[in-house]
Amino acid sequence: MPVANSKSTTKATKLVELLRDKRSLLIVMQDNPDPDSIAAAAALRRIANTLTDVHCSIAYGGVIGRSENRAVAGYLGLNFRSIEEIDLEKYDAVALVDTQPRAGNNSLPEERQPDIVLDHHPLRAETRAAPFSDVRKRYGAVSTILVEYLGELGISPDPPLATALLYAIRSDTQDLGTEAVQADIDAAEALYPLANTRMLSAIQRGRVPRSYYTALAKALENARVYGKCIIADLGDVDNPDMMGEMADLFLRHEGIEWVLCHGAHDGKLLLSMRTSQSRKRAGDVMKRIVSRIGTGGGHATAAGGQVPLKKGTRAEREGRHKTFRDRLLREVGGTNGRGRRLLGSA
């Protein structure tokens, strides 16, 4: 499965050299991991298990909530563990995948410096301290980096891993659309003959629980339209991935260019943003929306953020909602005021 890239040749070799000096590796994904995090972590584990004697564990914070994400994790057949169950002292190396130190979207304690950082979001200053890092913000998916590593190291992924990697790249690039670069397309083409296309289709049509429809009903009820923007407060959510799912859905509305969904989970307000236009990067807009009150970032058309709740009162949450709304509309030029309900006439 050759996928040529001179940078990956050098990086893959250095990665293996580092791992050969370690006994145990903890691979930490972003909180509430998506298919890109899951597949990339599995690929890093495959590299470590194939070429070194290092023992690997994969951990995450939050939950694996979205049906497609659960399907990918289940198909890989690996033991993905909550980081709360992990004794970090038992691992002499830690890797961050699809996230970076102090990015606000992973549960690795700040005092623990990662040895390896693999990501495709803008480089953070803290990442420079890692002995090994490969951050390519132009890439649509971190899985693309791992596919290049596999190719350079002569490792052919089995059907479950190839399927997970292919789905991850397609998912994170909007099916090889505006977020994709040539490297993502090349990686997807290399994976396709190795993937289980029947399973790929099954992942995309994953079953959802009744709670999904409850959350959907609440999102529809609370969504308000401000010109070319939709903003929706989902209230309390059990599944943090619901914000992203609803944002994807609302962006399909005719004439809508920006969507912001937020909801409360585990003492924080989680935000998800989508846009169909390219005048401003969603990741940059999200950073400004949560400036001085939380953390956030992302890519050109998709972004996420989180803001801690100090009291969790209704007044605090309504105040944050107003802040999010006002800042977004100031950024993208939507109609201010109360807006109008997506459903109904008020």
Q: What do the PLM-derived regions correspond to, one by one?
A:
Residues 71-132:
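Active-site cofactor/cluster-binding pocket
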Residues 279-296:
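Low-complexity, glycine/alanine/valine/leucine- and proline-rich hydrophobic stretches
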Residues 24, 55-57, 93, 114, ...:
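Residues at the starts of beta-strands that form the adenosine-phosphate
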Residues 273-274:
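Primary mode marks residue(s) on the alpha4-beta5-alpha5 output face of response regulator receiver
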Residues 2-32, 42-49, 125-268, 301-302, ...:
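A structured phosphate/pyrophosphate-recognition subdomain
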Residues 69-71, 88-91, 228-236:
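Short, basic, glycine/proline-bearing loop/turn elements
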Residues 22-88:
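Anionic-ligand anchoring segments at beta-strand to alpha-helix junctions in alpha/beta enzyme folds, i.e.
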